[in-house]
């Protein structure tokens, strides 16, 4: 039943709605300014500046919400406004959004502000946006004609090489390219190698999103090729080959490759979008099946992603009947983890008490999760969604899970009618725990898992992350076969750690002792000792020593620490090194620096490529 008033008579209701929308508009203006500034930082090669910009943007949303709440409380005494006025506030807000370019994000901002002011019992359809009120279909861009949401190119007129070159130059990047003709030839060769020669259909065209996607040391051109009924996704990373000189590093042509660069284990892109829903819709066409919640999150609108995820969860609960259960695997000392088998996520709660040897607090653990949220995750640390006051139907909770919840996290529980309200939780993508993957896998699986594990830890080292607890159970294997770290309660900056070699035993008694015969400080790490708990399985040992024998050498860890202390930032590639043009077409890069006249665009067979 609709309880909304027939007439909107409250001036205060309109004023509050307008104040809240002004708060959102300020937030989104700052959000876009960050993406615009990312272009300048990328052009200058200011990688530390880009890192700081990405970190600061993550906290910007909550800061704008708090500003808006404070303003509403100071000017309107918002907590004392009665329910009839709150109903009108929402209706006025809907009216103000009818021509807005980011209505879905503005609705989420409204919810965030309301949930700071109102008690949970008021979170109902009348007061907040449980479902979207404004459609995001066919929202038009207000930008100049030079920057629509995406540009369409028609290679039939000027040829594919000229079209590809125009696509790149239209982004008007300040640095020069080392050899754009060479790089375009590599793109054409890669397309030919992947798909062969195709006939052009009458609708043959290339669509390219008008903004670059910035992350780490790369800027990505993202688009799709249309030919007949076929749609081919692509992404082209641009990188500095030396200060002030750019090159196209590769072209990613497989959906799986794009899913990895847009995955939950990577940091959010910096990308300028006037109409975010149009970008999300476009990205959905090149990554079909990827939830909109994850796409919004990957482009930096994590609060909108979080909102959509919760709606997806509620929708799934209403169309499923299985029960939440304790997650399979070894139970953690710090976190209680449960899952819904039909839903590909896990729910993680910080326990009330931690048995020895754990020495930590709830606040410290939450700070570790916030550290990961703000850090560059490099595709090796799982992103988390943090929620408060999540109501789950008691009937959907397995009895064993309820007993575990009441035993381990009673302070987080509140029964409310037929629901169990959980005061705080983290939600992550469900992965196969690495220990189970290794335990149940064949020899090929074990080799892959160990190779990935070593790569993951080494990349975390380079990103200044020391995992702390490196047992296999704290890592997971994604659906793409990548190993990702997801247990953060002991995480530290590598630069805060003291890398040490194990001192030689002083005598036979030391050598036979089960306890260290040397002093161990709180931040001391001893890589030589890790083999004790990592190499028990002969298959694991064989693969480990084949691919990562240096893992247990303190010099490796110290070398990474020294590079970090010097302010050096290594290169990371969220795709196989073999896919880089300099590796798959090395003949094109011979004497690149000194070559005066570039080679032709492509070999004869590639010049006549017809894209499908």
Swiss-Prot record:
User: Does the keyword field hold Transmembrane helix?
Assistant: no
Under Pfam families, the record lists:
AceK_kinase (PF06315), AceK_regulatory (PF20423)
Entry EC number(s): 2.7.11.5, 3.1.3.-
What GO terms are given for molecular function?
[isocitrate dehydrogenase (NADP+)] kinase activity; AMP binding; ATP binding; phosphoprotein phosphatase activity; protein serine/threonine kinase activity
**GO annotation terms (biological process):** glucose metabolic process; glyoxylate cycle; tricarboxylic acid cycle
**Which positions bind ATP?**
327-333, 348
Q: Identify the InterPro entries for this entry.
A: AceK_kinase (IPR046855), AceK_regulatory (IPR046854), Isocitrate_DH_AceK (IPR010452)
What is one term from the GO cellular component aspect held by the record?
A: cytoplasm
The record's catalysed reaction(s) read: L-seryl-[isocitrate dehydrogenase] + ATP = O-phospho-L-seryl-[isocitrate dehydrogenase] + ADP + H(+)
| UniProt keyword Hydrolase, yes or no | yes
> What HAMAP family does the entry give?
AceK (MF_00747)
**Job of this protein:** Bifunctional enzyme which can phosphorylate or dephosphorylate isocitrate dehydrogenase (IDH) on a specific serine residue. This is a regulatory mechanism which enables bacteria to bypass the Krebs cycle via the glyoxylate shunt in response to the source of carbon. When bacteria are grown on glucose, IDH is fully active and unphosphorylated, but when grown on acetate or ethanol, the activity of IDH declines drastically concomitant with its phosphorylation.
**Similarity-based family:** Belongs to the AceK family.
Can you say what this protein is called?
Answer: Isocitrate dehydrogenase kinase/phosphatase
> What organism, scientifically named, is this protein from?
Paraburkholderia phytofirmans (strain DSM 17436 / LMG 22146 / PsJN) (Burkholderia phytofirmans)
